Amino acid sequence: MLINFVKMHGLGNDFMMVDNLAGDITFNAEQIANLANRHLGIGFDQLLLVETSNTKNVDFRYVIYNADGLEVEQCGNGARCFAFFVSKKGLSNNNPIVVETRSGIINLYLNDDNTVRVDMGKPSFNPADILLLVPQQSTYYQIEGFDLGAVSIGNPHCVMLVEDVNTVDVSSIALRIQQSELLPNQANIGFMQILNTHEINLRVYERGSGETLACGSGACAAVVYGVEQGLLKENVVAHLNGGDTLIEYIQGGHVFLSGPVQFVFEGKVEI
């Protein structure tokens, strides 16, 4: 089957976008992993599908697959690309665009400067929402010898405070944490260096994709954790390897993610 796709990225976090409103396209995990291969396929961090939703007052269903072919709950940078895609392809004139994910409903706001602001919803610190096997909720947890905060932004995140993100062995530490028995579903692991109360440096190792140039939900998780610990203020610029994103969060409220999106190319591929 020959399908149309668009390659997009948000701060280097890249995606294969597919219009599946007709519902006639299906992928298996092997196909997705092959397409995600950066040498033999298209190359991407996530595959994003635009599908119809049966939920009242919802415009689309937003389906997300990691590069390993497994479906996941949320992707913040992908949500920004999703909004831009459905708008530029003429699939919706709404603003905001309301989409349904595996973890709930989110609102996507298109700005005049080609950036998108995403209402990522209310974060959760409940270990059950993170699938963290601990007896009770705490401000931090010791996992594989590391002190970590844990937050759900619709998907599970652990956050580690570090002095310098450039000297951290991100891959080996993240893999060690992800393999912990306390995280049977794994988690995205963020390494946060606080520069001041309104700026952080951040690197994120995503489950199923490895370290990415940017992770929107990871930036949200890091800032939420920092605000909750009194280390950060309500508006924070997160500096990631792919660029900067703005996170807004007031304790007890929703968290918002803003940043640019970019079309890269479009084409057809046989699956």
Swiss-Prot record:
Keywords linked to the UniProt accession: Amino-acid biosynthesis, Cytoplasm, Isomerase, Lysine biosynthesis
Catalyzed reactions: (2S,6S)-2,6-diaminopimelate = meso-2,6-diaminopimelate
Entry's Gene Ontology cellular component terms: cytosol
Annotated EC: 5.1.1.7
A Pfam family annotated for this UniProt entry: DAP_epimerase
Enzyme class per UniProt: isomerase
Site note Could be important to modulate the pK values of the two catalytic cysteine residues, residues: 157, 206
Cellular compartment(s): Cytoplasm
Site entry: Important for dimerization: 265
GO function term, MF aspect, one: diaminopimelate epimerase activity
Assembly notes: Homodimer.
HAMAP family in the record: DAP_epimerase
Name the UniProt record assigns to this protein: Diaminopimelate epimerase
Organism encoding this protein: Ruthia magnifica subsp. Calyptogena magnifica
Gene: dapF
